[in-house]
Design a protein with these regions (language model features):
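Bacterial N-terminal signal peptides
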Residues: 5-15
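Extracytoplasmic/secreted proteins, especially bacterial periplasmic and envelope-associated proteins
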Residues: 38-41, 45, 107, 130-137
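Second-shell loop/turn segments in exported
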Residues: 29-34, 92-101, 117-126
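A structural motif
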Residues: 99-112
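Glycine-rich catalytic cores of cysteine/serine-nucleophile enzymes that process amide/ester linkages
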Residues: 22-94
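Sec/Tat signal peptide C-region and signal peptidase I cleavage site
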Residues: 15-22
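Activation targets extended, charge/polar-rich intrinsically disordered C-terminal tails
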Residues: 23, 110-176
Length: 176
C-alpha cells in the first residue's frame, strides 16, 4: 500500500498542470532612440500563472505621459499607464526578475490602477513622478530597496543598475 501511495505521488508530479504556479516580476529599461522617437523608459513585465485558480498572467506596465516631451519639461502633464508591444519588450534591457506571490501580484495590479490619471488630471512629472518612480514603488512592494536619487530620475538604465547593486540577494548583474 505504501508503494502505491509513493507511486501515485510521483505520477502526479509528472502530470501536466501539476507544476508549481508562479508569477515573475521583471524590471526593464529602454535606452532611448532619438531616431526611433522613443525616450529612455522603464517598465515592468508580469508573467506566469497564479497559484489560486491557475490564471495565466502576461502583462506589462510603464508610466508615461500622453503630452509631448516639451510639455513635460514645463511641469505637470497628463500621465498614462503604457502597455508595450512584445516586439518592443524584446529590444529592451531585462535587469532582474523575481518571483512574487498572488497577494503581491494583486497589490501590484491595484498600484497600477492607482497610478492611472482620471480625466483632466495632470500628475506626471518628469522629475518627481515618472516611469522610474512608478517602478520604484512596485520594487518596494516586492521587498526591494529602491530609492530614487535626484541625479537618476531621467536615467532608467542607470537607476535600475543602482537598484541591482542595492539588492545583492537578486543575484543580478548590471546591464552595460
Amino acid at each position: 500500500m505504501r508503494f502505491l501511495a509513493l507511486f501515485l505521488s510521483a505520477l502526479l508530479v509528472l502530470l501536466p498542470g501539476s507544476a508549481v504556479a508562479a508569477v515573475t516580476l521583471a524590471f526593464h529599461s529602454f535606452n532611448g532612440s532619438y531616431l526611433g522617437g522613443r525616450y529612455p523608459h522603464a517598465f515592468i513585465v508580469l508573467d506566469g500563472t497564479l497559484d489560486a485558480g491557475g490564471q495565466r498572467v502576461h502583462e506589462n506596465y510603464g508610466y508615461s505621459t500622453s503630452a509631448g516631451a516639451l510639455s513635460a519639461l514645463r511641469g505637470l502633464v497628463p500621465g498614462i499607464i503604457q502597455i508595450e508591444k512584445e516586439k518592443y519588450i524584446a529590444s529592451t534591457n531585462n535587469h532582474f526578475t523575481l518571483t512574487i506571490s498572488d497577494a503581491q501580484y494583486a497589490a501590484i495590479r491595484a498600484e497600477v490602477e492607482a497610478w492611472k490619471d482620471a480625466p483632466g488630471q495632470k500628475r506626471y512629472s518628469l522629475d518627481h513622478r515618472n516611469c522610474i518612480h512608478f517602478i520604484a514603488r512596485i520594487a518596494e512592494m516586492a521587498g526591494l530597496s529602491a530609492p530614487v536619487p535626484q541625479e537618476m530620475v531621467r536615467r532608467p538604465k542607470l537607476w535600475l543598475n543602482y537598484v541591482t547593486r542595492l539588492n545583492p540577494q537578486l543575484g543580478a548583474r548590471e546591464v552595460r
